[in-house]
A protein has these predicted regions:
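N-terminal post-signal-peptidase region of extra-cytosolic proteins
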Residues: 45-48, 63-69
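Ligand-binding loop in jelly-roll beta-barrel domains
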Residues: 90, 111-136
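Histidine-centered catalytic micro-motifs
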Residues: 71-78, 113-119
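Short, conserved beta-strand element in jelly-roll/cupin
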Residues: 62-66, 76-91, 130-132
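Bacterial Sec-dependent N-terminal signal peptides
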Residues: 1-22
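Short acidic-glycine-tyrosine-enriched beta hairpin
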Residues: 95-112
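A short, N-terminal "cap"/entry segment at the start of jelly-roll beta-barrel domains
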Residues: 17-57, 137-157
Length: 157
């Protein structure tokens, strides 16, 4: 029995590695690449976890925004879902009051509704964005408007 166990023990890592090559594995844990400074202020990193293709109708992108970074107003032709996995942020739809997002929150931006999301002044935010199609950028989010939201939603110390 002992003689059979030893060879199997040493072969196990190779079997596991061989199995992984049969699958298309991605990880949202990787930071991604620094995004070009377009349609936002501050710093952002994007990890395109999954890209839509002929067999998949949506994208999943992990986005990390450093504290005090903002994303401009935009909309999508189909609903977008944001899943906050780290930090805290802000979210606002046109014509509605802004809200503060925290780890574990999931929010759905309805199709064709202008909205923005960003990190808080104090904390980075990381979220998974699940969406289809292109993003349509509609308006620059002014620093004064972001600061007003930050002051309104500031957590008491």
């Amino acid at each position: 029995m002992k003689k059979k166990f030893v060879p199997l023990f040493f072969m196990f890592p190779f079997v596991v590695l061989a199995q992984n090559s049969q699958y298309n594995l991605n990880s949202y844990l990787e930071q991604g690449t620094k995004a070009p400074n377009t349609h936002y202020l501050g710093e952002a990193w994007l990890n395109r976890v999954l890209q839509a293709d002929e067999n998949l109708s949506f994208n999943i992108t992990k986005a990390t925004f450093s504290a005090n970074s903002t994303l401009d107003w935009h909309k999508h032709s189909e609903s977008q879902v944001l899943v906050v996995v780290d930090g805290s942020g802000y979210y606002q739809e046109k014509g509605k009051n802004p809200i503060r997002l925290k780890v574990g929150d999931i929010i759905r931006a309805p199709a064709n509704v202008e909205h923005w999301h960003a990190a808080t002044k104090e904390n980075d935010v990381t979220y998974l964005a699940i969406y289809s199609g292109e993003t349509q950028w509609t308006q620059v989010l002014l620093r004064e408007d972001y600061d007003r939201v930050a002051n309104t939603l500031k957590v008491p110390q």
